[in-house]
Amino acid sequence: MEKTFVRVHSIKDIVIFISLLVLGGLLVAIPASDAVNIAGFFLLFAGIILALVLKTGYKDVETAAKYHKKERYFQQTMHTTIANAIASKPDSIDLSEENKGNAIKLDIYYSKVTGKAYIQLLEYVPYTYQPCSNMYEYDLSKINKLIK
């Protein structure tokens, strides 16, 4: 299965940069000392920059459904174990081996609205992670252990 996810603004991102813009605008607008106005300009600038670069949500290109992403890292020796587990029973992955290496990355895209989750295994090659398994679709209830 070929799925493509693109980065988009999440609700949390929008709330953060709008509140920075509003707070910065208020600090600039009130007649106060120069230090308060400078702080207001700094908050306005930070809000504008975050509006441009902060994108923590993911959207499925085909369905336009929004997803969250969870990444888990494992050592190379876990490759076959994890590849077999995500193909049949993803809850059987041993999370005690997590963060003992970063040669294998497990990407989990999940949505509580749709109740779906997509899992893919990626392998580190110099400077990037390349997919080394198919994208598997599961119900959210089957992978609760992986997204906690």
Predicted regions and their residues:
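Cytosolic juxtamembrane segments of membrane proteins
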Residues: 58-105
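Hydrophobic alpha-helical transmembrane segments
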Residues: 16, 31-46
